[in-house]
Each structure stands twice: as structure tokens, then as C-alpha cells.
Amino acid sequence: MIKIKTFLLLFFFTAFSTTGVYSQAKKFPSPPSADAIKNPLKGDGTSTTAGKLIYVKYCVTCHGDKGKGDGIAAPGLPKRPADHTSSFVQSQTDGALYWIISAGNNPMPTYKKTLTPTQRWQVVNYIRTLANTSKK
């Protein structure tokens, strides 16, 4: 009887102690220093509108028109594009999002030379609005 209780105790302890590992989101692939980068356009509605135009031109193909990572190119990619409406992406700092847009994240290309710093911040501001529209 003691062996059965010990087995059950170990089984449940192991099962429940490792469950959190699988449910935790992966770390965003930006360096910790990216969190300190401050958004100079935060809360600017004009920049959000400009960001949407840039997003449509450069991001929709992979991330989809609502930012869910379901664009027309997504099925052919080696890993699914980020869902910009997700709590995981929305919980990242503006600096981390800016860093990813700038540096890229394979297979996502870098936009450091394609977009100006202002344009990259505009995209960050637009991504922030996607959480509010994800249920529509």
C-alpha cells in the first residue's frame, strides 16, 4: 500500500510540476536591453494610421490582415508568424517589438534598412491596436 501511495504521490507531483513548463510562453527573441528602448511616438493616433499603411504593405502577407499570424504566406513558412493579437505579443515592451521589427526573426526579415526608425515605431503603435480588434 505504501508503494502505491508513493507512486501516486510521485506521479502527480511530476505531472503537475512540469505542466507549467509547457504552458509558459517562450521568451521573446529580443535582448533584455531592448526593453529600455522608449517609444517616441507612443499614443500618437497619426502614427498609428501611418503604421497601418506600412503594416498592410510589409506585414499582412505573413501576419494576416488582423495580425493573427495567418497571412497567405504563413502556411509555407518553417514556423508560424507571431500572432500580434495574442497576450504574449501584447505583453512585450514597445522596445522589444521595435527591436524585432528592426532585427528580424528568421524567417521574418530585418526592416532596419527598409523602414526608417519613425516608420518602425509607427508599426509598433499599429500592432498595439490589433489587440483591441482581435474579437471583431
Segments the model singles out, each with a brief description of its role:
Residues 1-8:
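Bacterial N-terminal signal peptides that target proteins for export
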Residues 18-23:
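Sec/Tat signal peptide C-region and signal peptidase I cleavage site
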Residues 25-54:
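Electrostatic cytochrome c docking/interface patches
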Residues 41-42, 48, 68-96:
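Gly/Gly-Pro-rich "capping" loops immediately C-terminal to redox-active cysteine motifs
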Residues 45-68, 74, 102-103:
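Sequence/structural segment immediately N-terminal to covalent heme-attachment motifs in c-type
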